[in-house]
């Protein structure tokens, strides 16, 4: 299987939103919850334009996405979604590794995310550790929490990138 990873384009938004909804439905969440998450699962053209969003393609078909929100030395993963039929195929790993390398190149030293409870094992296999939990914000189930996960990035790569960035700003 040949996996291509590229930056998302704003016109990919509708496909990415459909993948996000399909991924949530895969875990048999009640339809009422899916409806509550409708806004959170929507990936807009504006979001794609304002953030670093990557898509994975197989046979020129988008099968997954991962968004990075970068600030200083922190990278936050948002909207990591795979088509359910592609889960477990290695595409998620390739997409995660691509996003991780990109965050390192941009100078991030820490990668954090709030995981769906069903995806916590995947992120743990990628090297992230649970650092806490946050309320899921579900009306009707206030006890539901999301694992908060973090991983240190290759500080050597981040350090080299920061030095290059610092040198270029001095010229």
Q: What spans do the regions from the language model cover?
A:
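Conserved active-site tyrosine of GNAT-family acetyltransferases
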Residues: 123, 128
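A short beta-loop-alpha structural element at the N-terminal edge
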Residues: 4-18
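Conserved beta-strand in the GNAT
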Residues: 55, 61-69, 76-81
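A short helix-loop-beta-strand connector motif used in the catalytic cores of GNAT acetyltransferases and
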Residues: 43-55, 76
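Conserved acetyl-CoA-binding loop-helix of GNAT-fold acetyltransferases
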Residues: 82, 88-101
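Conserved catalytic-core motifs of GNAT/GCN5-like acyltransferases
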Residues: 112-114, 129-150
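Conserved GNAT-fold acetyl-CoA-binding loop/helix
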Residues: 17-43
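Conserved GNAT acetyl-CoA-binding A-motif
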Residues: 103-115
């Amino acid at each position: 299987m040949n996996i291509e990873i590229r930056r998302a384009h704003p016109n990919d938004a509708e496909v990415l939103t459909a993948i996000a909804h399909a991924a949530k439905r895969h875990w048999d969440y009640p339809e009422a919850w899916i409806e509550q998450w409708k806004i959170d699962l929507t990936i807009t053209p504006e979001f794609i334009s304002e953030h670093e969003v990557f898509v994975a393609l197989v046979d020129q078909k988008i099968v997954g996405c991962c968004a990075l929100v970068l600030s200083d030395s922190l990278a936050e993963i948002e909207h990591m979604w795979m088509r359910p039929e592609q889960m477990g195929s290695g595409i998620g790993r390739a997409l995660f590794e691509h996003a991780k390398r990109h965050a390192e190149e941009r100078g991030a030293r820490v990668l954090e995310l709030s995981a769906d409870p069903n995806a916590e094992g995947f992120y743990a296999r990628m090297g992230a550790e649970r650092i806490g939990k946050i309320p899921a914000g579900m009306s009707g189930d206030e006890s539901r929490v999301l694992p908060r996960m973090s991983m240190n990035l290759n500080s050597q790569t981040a350090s080299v990138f920061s030095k290059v960035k610092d040198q270029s700003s001095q010229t």
